[in-house]
């Protein structure tokens, strides 16, 4: 009898153990099912036309993300893509990654969000981004852990009521003497830095990032060489600058879609901080690479080029991006933005350069002539202008800055005559004065990388030239 009872007891314990294991397995399966992507809709890849992937049978919205079936070395390695357009039954996608390994008829799955809507990528926002380097999709590039963020946003463009903008009245101290004294910038202004390659653009940007009085700095490195991205972070910006900065990088070798996303994401981050009453400095290097990425996609979609290979849509894309920055009366924060524009030869013939100059609130021109002389920063004062400067400085500084530019222009236009001794003193009063104080003018315009010149000191230095 005892043996029978013992047997029943053993069987009961065994059944309880099996039941507990069964419940554990169910819980495990439920957990694994919850982690599966919500994918219920898929189409088939029928064509690859340049950058564009053409899919049939896919019912999804523009901006939503998809997974494309891919096989590499016999293993599945699906890649992410985004819907950018459609025509009839065809849907057009652009991949975020290299498309090597994609095959005809590959299945293209539409991602579905938890609310059963099409999946649109949400990007991290918040103070946790400071000191981090991310790509255009919010993924870390600095080999640090993923960001545990409280806030997120989708990339979207929207128009801002012009009556919600506040006039620019406050000076922004950039720490650069030539800019503070002669091209004074206001908080909330939009400025372009026009430069060809190799004349100190990155160094000037680094000085602006390090010395400008701003709460938060957002830097978008669009289409730059990978080496330059690392060099800018480590050697030009430095650890002190990085600690109050967010860097969004999309190097030259990534998808044009990622470059566009990076530019928009950086602007989103700047908008988040200004809405939280922060004064934000947004630096985008470069606007030209952003325009080139837009051109690649537009031409692949079949748009016709209208000017220097650029389609007509570029003339709305650039203003849409730039106009999201500024100063607004509903918030105490602001976004002051610097956009670099690459120029080669006659920049007036370049549609991006021409458009940027018309949209921005001023431009700083860098000169190869000055750079070749070892004159840094290589700012061409004659060709540069700050459109809000007359409204934010006193009459004395404005008069001195205007006269300074006249002296420089007169000297540069007669440099050859001066150098060969052909100029006769007394012929031109302005030129006589320029020759007399030229060493002082040159000294004012030049500044070491490690030297900071605040706004008041810059104004004092300008005043001393004419005493």
Swiss-Prot record:
Cellular component per GO, a single term: type III protein secretion system complex
Q: Supply the name of the protein.
A: Flagellum-specific ATP synthase
Cellular location of this protein? Answer: Cytoplasm
Instruction: Provide the binding site for ATP.
Output: 195-202
Origin species: Buchnera aphidicola subsp. Acyrthosiphon pisum (strain APS)
- Name the Enzyme Commission number(s) assigned to this protein: 7.1.2.2
UniProt family annotation: Belongs to the ATPase alpha/beta chains family.
Recorded catalytic activity of this chain's protein = ATP + H2O + 4 H(+)(in) = ADP + phosphate + 5 H(+)(out)
Stretches assigned to coiled coil: none
Which keywords belong to this entry? Answer: ATP synthesis, ATP-binding, Bacterial flagellum biogenesis, Bacterial flagellum protein export, Cytoplasm, Hydrogen ion transport, Ion transport, Nucleotide-binding, Protein transport, Translocase, Transport
Which GO biological-process labels does this protein carry?
bacterial-type flagellum organization; protein secretion by the type III secretion system
* Group of enzyme by EC: translocase
Q: What is its main location?
A: cytoplasm
Query: Which domain of life does the UniProt lineage start with?
Result: Bacteria
GO MF, any single term = proton-transporting ATP synthase activity, rotational mechanism
Function noted in UniProt:
Probable catalytic subunit of a protein translocase for flagellum-specific export, or a proton translocase involved in local circuits at the flagellum. May be involved in a specialized protein export pathway that proceeds without signal peptide cleavage.
């Amino acid at each position: 009898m005892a043996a029978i009872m013992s047997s029943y007891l053993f069987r009961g314990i065994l059944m309880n153990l099996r039941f507990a294991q069964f419940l554990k397995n169910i819980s495990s399966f439920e957990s694994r099912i919850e982690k599966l992507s919500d994918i219920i809709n898929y189409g088939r890849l029928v064509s690859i036309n340049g950058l564009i992937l053409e899919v049939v049978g896919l019912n999804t919205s523009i901006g939503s993300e998809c997974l494309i079936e891919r096989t590499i070395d016999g293993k599945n390695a699906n890649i992410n893509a985004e819907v950018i357009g459609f025509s009839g039954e065809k849907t057009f996608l652009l991949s975020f990654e290299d498309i090597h390994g994609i095959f005809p008829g590959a299945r293209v799955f539409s991602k579905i969000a938890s609310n059963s809507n099409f999946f649109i990528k949400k990007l991290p926002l918040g103070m946790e981004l400071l000191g981090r380097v991310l790509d255009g999709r919010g993924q870390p590039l600095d080999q640090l852990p993923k960001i545990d963020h409280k806030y997120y946003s989708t990339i979207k463009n929207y128009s801002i009521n012009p009556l919600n903008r506040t006039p620019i009245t406050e000076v922004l101290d950039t720490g650069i003497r030539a800019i503070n004294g002669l091209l004074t910038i206001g908080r909330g202004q939009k400025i372009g830095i026009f430069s060809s390659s190799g004349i100190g653009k990155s160094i000037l940007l680094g000085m602006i990032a390090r010395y400008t009085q701003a709460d938060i700095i957002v830097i978008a490195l669009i289409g730059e060489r990978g080496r330059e991205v690392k060099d800018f972070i480590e050697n030009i910006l430095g650890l002190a600058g990085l600690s109050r900065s967010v860097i969004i990088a999309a190097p030259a070798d990534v998808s044009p879609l990622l470059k566009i996303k990076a530019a928009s994401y950086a602007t989103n981050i700047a908008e988040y901080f200004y809405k939280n009453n922060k004064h934000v400095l947004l630096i985008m290097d470069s606007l030209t690479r952003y325009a080139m990425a837009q051109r690649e996609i537009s031409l692949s979609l079949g748009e016709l080029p209208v000017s220097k290979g650029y389609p007509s849509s570029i003339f709305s894309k650039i203003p849409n991006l730039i106009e999201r920055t500024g100063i607004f009366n509903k918030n105490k924060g602001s976004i002051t933005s610097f956009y670099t524009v690459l120029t080669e030869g006659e920049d007036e013939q370049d549609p991006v350069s021409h458009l940027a100059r018309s949209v921005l609130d001023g431009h700083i021109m860098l000169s190869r002539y000055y750079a070749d002389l070892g004159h840094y920063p290589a700012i061409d004062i004659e060709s540069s202008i700050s459109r809000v400067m007359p409204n934010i400085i006193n009459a004395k500084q404005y008069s001195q800055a205007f006269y300074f530019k006249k002296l420089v222009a007169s000297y540069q236009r007669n440099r050859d005559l001066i150098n060969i001794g052909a100029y006769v003193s007394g012929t031109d009063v302005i030129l006589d004065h320029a020759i007399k104080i030229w060493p002082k003018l040159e000294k004012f315009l030049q500044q070491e990388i490690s030297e900071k010149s605040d706004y008041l000191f810059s104004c004092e230095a300008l005043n001393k030239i004419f005493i």
